Amino acid sequence: MPKIVDHDKQRLLVAEAAWRIIRRDGMEQASVRNIAEEAGISAGSMRHYFSTQSELLLYAMNLVSERVSNRIKQMSFNGSPMENMKLLLLEFMPNTDEKMAEMEVWFAFTAKSKTDPALKALADKVYDEIRQAIATVITYIVKLNLSRANLNEELEIERLYALVDGLSIHAVLRPDQMTYEIMENALSLHLAALCRAEE
């Protein structure tokens, strides 16, 4: 009797194998042969799951975005407005080992997207979604009348986006210096600085 293979599960296992290679050996080693070996399948059987290497890499890159989106959908926002906003923003930052692994892979894909149109389209879409989430945080602060006087919303969106992105990059490149605690404290201080002083 032929072995029944769960196609979606196998695609996921292959993508996770690609992640491991990218984290351990770099994007240049993420060949079909190397990924197949890491996944424990033959290179020939890879075509049953992905027709091209580009399709595989696009799927693996999109998997990072899907995992972040799924975590956000499952979040319960039960704290204060500031706590809730911080929780949301931390989903885009590598403040756990799991998210650090995802971020390392994401940045490798982002670098490759400079020369791969399909990856670039996905990267642009995801970065636009992150910017929209950050814009929502700034709008929320203003609508709740928490913001300091004369807050320039457009400028503050860019500043907060730069902070989230910059802290994330530093955490990936220098995890010994940009610890999870420092990252979270820097975000908290920035959010507090956006708000008017309590009377």
Q: What residue spans do the PLM features occupy?
A:
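Amphipathic alpha-helical packing segments from all-alpha helical-bundle domains
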Residues: Q74, E98-F107, P117-K143, E158, ...
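N-terminal intrinsically disordered/low-complexity leader segments
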Residues: M1-K9, E198-E199
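Helix-loop "lid/cap" segments that line or gate small-molecule binding pockets
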Residues: L90-D97, E104-T115, H190
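Generic hydrophobic, amphipathic alpha-helix propensity
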Residues: H7-A18, I35, A60-V64, V68, ...
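Hydrophobic alpha-helical connector segments
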Residues: Y59-N62, K73-E102, E153-L160
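Residues in soluble alpha-helical coiled-coils and helical-bundle/repeat scaffolds
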Residues: S51-E55, S76, S80, D97, ...
